[in-house]
């Protein structure tokens, strides 16, 4: 009947609208994920391998570990930190006050060569030195966001976490996902007596990654054979950090494909029905 035909046409149109909305949503999610993966993080994440050591090995053998790794010509340098940066949405946080302003900041306690190994530029003041690691007074390097937001100055005393001085400022880095905004970040170097179990291994450009990974594995088995170590690169770390977004993209894509298939089946069914209806009218 004419009313039935109108209803069928309306339903097909609704299916097409739903399909188009889902396709647009899938495209938007894909663009968003691509943007997050290609966003400039402020540090050189390529050619960096990360290996977590147990505290005993770090305390006893970290110098041997570095020297043994650097025997491979594909390894440029090795740095250490307490945190695996870039892997989560929050880090050790401290509250402080500067020139009467209260603020929160992430604390990254690291070795003196950490910024250089990670490719983080110092924009004002100086970088950490080996002497800073031996000092009982902490050397602080804050990021640009903290420097500009709090009007920080090189040479100022700072004792929010431990007594020390501001020796410089780095460019902004993004160690959390893009779900949040810019964070105040402080890099700290000093004679804390803490273990820094996360090792950052900078590979030279053009090095044989498989050979380097094999050398790292051999070194770990030699120095700490019972420890179940894992070698990570930032591609893997970001896959974990943005897993929710990846799952959403996959889910929207699947529903979009299902909606398209259902719409095509509906159109095919409508064509078949109309053909049969016309035949009956002619007959």
Feature-to-residue mapping (PLM):
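Membrane-proximal extracellular/periplasmic loop immediately following the first transmembrane helix
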Residues: 31-96, 101-102, 107
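Membrane-interface helix-boundary signature
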Residues: 4-11, 242-252
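"Rare, low-scoring activations can occur
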Residues: 60, 64-77, 144-148, 152, ...
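Intracellular coupling helices
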Residues: 1, 265-283
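Hydrophobic secondary-structure segments that place a key small or acidic residue at a functional site
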Residues: 104-184
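Alpha-helical transmembrane segments of integral membrane proteins
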Residues: 1-54, 249-269
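Transmembrane alpha-helix boundary/anchor motif
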Residues: 24-31, 233, 262-266
């Amino acid at each position: 009947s004419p009313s039935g035909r109108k209803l069928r046409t309306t339903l097909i149109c609704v299916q097409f609208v739903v399909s188009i909305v889902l396709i647009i949503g899938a495209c938007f999610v894909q663009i968003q994920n691509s943007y997050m993966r290609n966003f400039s993080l402020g540090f050189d994440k390529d050619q960096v391998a990360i290996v977590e050591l147990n505290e005993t090995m770090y305390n006893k053998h970290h110098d041997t570990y570095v020297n043994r790794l650097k025997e491979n010509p594909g390894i440029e340098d090795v740095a250490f930190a307490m945190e695996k940066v870039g892997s989560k949405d929050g880090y050790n946080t401290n509250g402080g006050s500067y020139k009467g302003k209260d603020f929160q900041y992430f604390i990254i306690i690291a070795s003196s060569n950490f910024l250089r190994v990670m490719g983080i530029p110092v924009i004002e003041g100086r970088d950490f030195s080996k002497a800073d690691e031996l000092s009982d007074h902490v050397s602080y390097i804050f990021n640009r966001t903290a420097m500009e937001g709090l009007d920080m100055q090189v040479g100022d005393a700072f004792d929010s976490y431990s007594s020390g001085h501001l020796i410089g400022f780095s460019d902004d880095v993004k160690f959390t996902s893009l779900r949040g905004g810019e964070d105040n970040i402080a890099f700290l170097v000093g004679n804390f007596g803490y273990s820094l179990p996360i090792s950052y291994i900078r590979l030279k450009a053009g090095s044989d990654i498989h050979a380097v990974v094999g050398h790292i594995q051999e070194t770990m088995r030699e120095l700490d054979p019972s420890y179940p170590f894992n070698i990570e690169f930032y591609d893997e770390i970001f896959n974990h950090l943005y897993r929710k977004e990846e799952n959403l993209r996959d889910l929207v894509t699947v529903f979009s494909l299902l909606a398209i298939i259902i719409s095509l089946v509906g159109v095919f069914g409508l064509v078949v029905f109309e053909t049969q209806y016309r035949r009956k009218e002619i007959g």
